[in-house]
Amino acid sequence: MVKRSNSYESRAEIVSSAKRLFQQYGYKKTTVSDIAKAMGKVKSAIYYYFPDKESLLRAVIDEEIGKLIRSIKDAVERASTPEEKLRVYALTRSFEIRRLSTEYARFQEEYDQLFPLVKEIHERYDHFERDTLKGILEVGMELGHFNKTDSEVLADTILLWLKGLEAQLSSFGSEEALKEAVEHLVNVLLFGIKVR
């Protein structure tokens, strides 16, 4: 049992070190040797847990996506009404995506190289987003807060809006400006579907 714990801690330490270096130097410029050196270990210690640098990047991205999902779930669970759930979903998602795009700014320069991996991970995350939004919408419809409509189509539409906003994150100079834009977007959405 102790060995498993040490194994988990070693793996987590490697992922944490890789994350720091990927953020600082980008994926392309970070080597497995750099990661090992930053930890005071040899390369073979990294390869014991990860067969290559890409699998290490996958672990880093999976960890970040896990944090993103937990943040969104926690925020949505704390909200009491379907309207508030939509609002906190959109705000939390936008702030977390902004945080990630800032922390991993160097990845934008390497996007073409990383596209296949990013696309695969994005597709998994899209399922979570679609299911979460669909659930919020369906509860809102059942409670009579939202007009009855195709929740799947509406969830996809909301995601398109949020992704459009996501593409423009760098144009918002402050978190307050981003919050205001998200609030406007949610208000347009709510007053378009809210039962009067």
Description of each model-found segment:
Residues 1, 95, 131-142, 156-161, ...:
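C-terminal peripheral helix-coil segments that are non-catalytic and often amphipathic
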Residues 1-9:
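N-terminal intrinsically disordered/low-complexity leader segments
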Residues 2, 13, 17, 21-55, ...:
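Helix-turn-helix
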Residues 15, 57, 61, 65, ...:
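Amphipathic, non-transmembrane alpha-helical scaffold segments
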